[in-house]
Amino acid sequence: LTLSVYATASDVLRHLAPPTARAAALARLRPLRVSRVFLEGRRGDEYVPPATLAEVRDFLAAQGLASAGGIATVPGTNFGVRQNEGLGWLNWEAEKTRRDVAHFFTENAAVFDTLIVDDFFCTGDTSPASAAARGTRSWAAYRRDLLVSLIKPLMLGPARAQRPDVQLIIKFPQWYDRFHLFGYDPERMAEPFAQVWVGTEVRNPHTRRMGYVPPTEGYVNFRWLHAVCGEKTTGAWFDHIECTAENFTDQAFQSVLAGARELTLFRLGDLMADHPGDALLAQRLPELFELAAKVRQRTPHGLAWYKPPNSDAEDNLYLADYLAQMGLPVLPVARWPADAREVCLGAQAAADPEATPRLQAHLAAGHTAAVTPAFLRRAGPTAQRLAGVKVGPAAEPTEASRVQVGARHHVLPRPLEVDGSLVAGTARVRLAGTVAGGTSVPLLTEQRTGRGRLLVLNLRTFDEGDLHAAGEWLLCPKPLGWSELPAPVAGAVREVLLAPLRVRLEAPAGVGLYLWNGAACLYNFHDVAVRVRFNGRALELPPHGPYWVERPGPARRPAAAASEGDFHGAGRPR
């Protein structure tokens, strides 16, 4: 594991270009064991001349630090052409945008042997020029085709003309369920780049500005991009924005648990401002390096969450983040996981035209699948018959304020977002919730299908309409109750979903579970220590930290489980 720091163009000019400022910058880098600094040459109108970059590069080399170049492809008054929609992205049909980006790579490849493209290589432009170029394609397909087509003429070509062996890195943002809408196509984009960096910058999950993003999203994003892009997926990149010290180190640990081999801290200016996360990260580096060594020796496994590339999420946006936050060992995959013991299918999986026959074969082999109402709606009547339930032609968003576990009713700290159209037919209702008016709705159903089991988890996150209503384009627009399940309710869900994996976890939501062959790791996102039971073993998890378990062994099942009550009335027509 190595650490690097990204210096924006303004950071370079302020903290590294003046010789009198360099000692202070080095004093911030040394405690974090930084071995490389990315020196950005362009961010809109912020610009560092090549001669200055070369001088800083040589200074860093004399201090034993490697360097690389970087660009944030954002518009400025004198750089590129701004798109006509709300976010500060470029219009890539504009000739000036193309000319300016190509010029950057010509200039900077002469200085650096490695260049990284920050996560603004996207667009939401709908100008007449873009509309004409789009033709009959969807906006999403057009944008992906456009940006993929520009990599070689605007980036690789100009860079290699200066330095034939130059290495280019693409950095993807964290909003994986929205990539395909705004031009990101990881499957095709990874091919021309030497390496892939992943945004694991989830920040503070309790603040609105950067979205109420679950702290598990960085892990999910990295693992899914690794599934798409393979071993090119090398680095994780996260920042200090809105973070407490603990939020900041959570990002580091989640990146390492996902398999990152390099951690890039954004940005040098925040290190110079004495963000408290840096001191805490420096203190916890031995723990982080030890964890990285353990993870690198092993192959992850768990609940295979299937998201094909370029798949729409509908009302299951960022579903996997919430599953992981509930303590389910989510393992994102981008191809059908034929050998998986258990699969999880949200609306994303239904983008695979073979999803239903593959599901049938999976069940026929005696395996387990967990699906959402959104998947069943897209997959159609055959999938609904397999599950023993029905869903309406459109989702009926509602909230469950109470959950029945066995004979007890639990009032929830935050209501659960569910689909009120789900009706249990022949399926057994394992958990039921109470929605407005006292109506009961299934939360978890089970149907035996041959030797297999098909579960329906009535989990709704949010959809395009929810984003628009909140004025949000990319990230989670509100906190969800699924992230705050009390221990008895979370345990009842886990009991059913973890059984095929021979794992048992009794804990509140906010405790993550990660599995490898012969090992497991628990991660406590809470601000206080949490007592849990894992496979029958009582453990106390420190706040904001990992707890590694070697040879966890199979789960020990208690004599009676609280979630074994049946609620066959739930979700039936009233």
Which residues fall in each region the model found?
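Active-site neighborhood of glycoside hydrolase catalytic domains
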Residues: A110-M189
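A conserved amphipathic helix/loop scaffold
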Residues: A347-R574
